[in-house]
Amino acid sequence: MWPVARFRASLTATRGRVGSGDPARVRQIDGQFALVHKQGRIVRMARSIGRPLRYFIAKRAEGPCLIVAERIDEIARFLEQEGLAGQFHPSYTRMVPAHYVTEVALVGCPDPNPVYTRYFNPQRNRLSHNLDEIGQAYIGSLAQALSGWLDRIDPAAPLGVLFSGGVDSGSVLLVLYHLLLSRGQSAARLKAFTLSVAGSGADARQAREFLDRLDLAYLLETIEVPESALNVRDAIRVIEDYKPLDVQSATAGLALCRAIRDRYPDWRYLVDGDGGDENLKDYPIEENPELTIRSVLNNTMLYQEGWGVGAIKHSLTYS
């Protein structure tokens, strides 16, 4: 663990990268982050895909007031405390889009649109058509990220993977398993948690088959919950979003996390993996009338960013 002074110095320097507005400097920030930098009337914000960052501009007699928080309800509570609740509406909040530096000028009414500068811009067609080369690069990046994470956490803490037996969670589980053994640590600290609702579910069967084939069934722990544990309203409240697939995923994930917390009150670290199919441009376009082969291929970051900040369908509030 880092000493407090070193952590603060690092945070100040990292915020300075965002404050520079230089996308190349922001791109060098490692790990997940959500950062805000203010210089005079100019506020710059940036986040990675794993951290939400929302903002709202309120009006005070002395000028515009920028409120920044992770959640919409945090913004609402702050405005209520400040006697500004009458200005609030959820649709007036804005999400800082991932992979951009968002620059807001606090110059008063009318508030100008923010300026977006992309700092993460992956290049297309960098790799050959060799699937082994693509797989090595993809899983190698995953291993590098997980290894850095293991370096920062308690080496004795138990680790859980939210496991469906699919390629994404399977890759995360196997890479973690490999990393623990390569560090001379016990794989017994690793568990594959799988949700089973009312004694049924394809994930539980798939998870068992996956691990049986690898002689790793001892890692599996199936978490049984009743149908009543699936609470859509709670899921929407947690993610503050409405898209059906996201709500469906969050509903199951929340039920699984709550059951793990009940069973292991002190468990702290959970890892999840998703989006691998989409990263390799495998989309069920037959199930989504909005998607075409052209829209999938022409939008490099479709899974992570949706239609993108320059598209008419992009949601400023939910992204």
Where are the regions a protein language model picked out?
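Short glycine-rich phosphate-binding loop at a beta-alpha junction
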Residues: 158-161, 269-273
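Catalytic subdomain that performs nucleotidyl-dependent activation
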Residues: 287-319
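Cysteine-centered catalytic environments shared across enzyme families
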Residues: 1-223
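Low-complexity, flexible helical/coil segments
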Residues: 80-86, 226-231, 254-261, 304-313
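Short glycine/proline-rich turn/loop motifs
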Residues: 119-129, 234-241, 315-318
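Catalytic metal-binding/acid-base residues of hydrolase active sites
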Residues: 168, 275-277
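ATP-dependent adenylate-handling ligase core
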Residues: 195-260, 264, 277-297
